């Protein structure tokens, strides 16, 4: 089972840069997309439902902003747009505030060869624009944690694909020394991810296959300066899975031969009958 995760930085822009044509060559079973930056009315039939796929989306209320989507060859048994009432916790940010930004889409596939499977497209907020958005990001992380705990305990196999906007370790970004006080590499953000892996029980699938890879692991490059040309990148896009599902991962790669956005596609193949 081949799963691709990609922050499109705008589905219309990425389509103009050839992403739909590229996807046809990939024959992926599931494609998780983030930062759609469009509403349904803005999208062509090819964007909504590429040939051979079912398309599902969770749009942001604000036009041209955020939004996530999933293409799947198999029709999902259930589609969950947003976190709704599944989130607990006592953070100041309301669930409605989070869901209005179109950041969570879950497709459930039941009675598969691995049991009941959920694939989620996730777009965690960035806090790089200022203190207000960083506060929102921390609040979303606090709100999201009980849901992540519940998913692990649900008995389903789960793969969460997306832009987490956090580089976990020093090997996950080029300039780690200069970014220790910057959003995306703050100690609190990194500790939160560590907790997901070490305490909650999630597995960083790429890292399970490539535990020491550095320069080749990056998935995002700033548009400023010559970040792409000099490979001054960050690994902030992940496929995070329940342990049994992660154990089925066979290969993981990052596609950089073409550029469809400021992110690169993360491609993972799972052993799946």
Sequence positions of predicted segments:
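Metal-dependent phosphoesterases centered on the DNase I-like endonuclease/exonuclease/phosphatase
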Residues: 27, 51-54, 140-232, 236
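Active-site-proximal beta-strand elements of phosphoester/diester hydrolases
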Residues: 1-9, 115-128, 161
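Structured beta-strand-rich core segments of catalytic domains in phosphoester-bond hydrolases
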Residues: 36-37, 45-125
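Acidic carboxylate-rich catalytic motifs and surrounding loops in phosphoryl-/glycosyl-chemistry enzymes
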Residues: 83-84, 204-213, 252-256
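Active-site beta-strand/loop signature of hydrolases that rely on acidic residues for catalysis
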Residues: 6-7, 23-41, 119, 147-170, ...
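Surface-exposed cleft-lining segments at the edges of enzyme active sites
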Residues: 84-96, 124-141, 177-182
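N-terminal, active-site-proximal structural segment of metallo-dependent hydrolase catalytic domains
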Residues: 1-50, 54-68, 196
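Conserved beta strand-loop-helix elements of the APE1-like EEP
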Residues: 63-79, 224-247
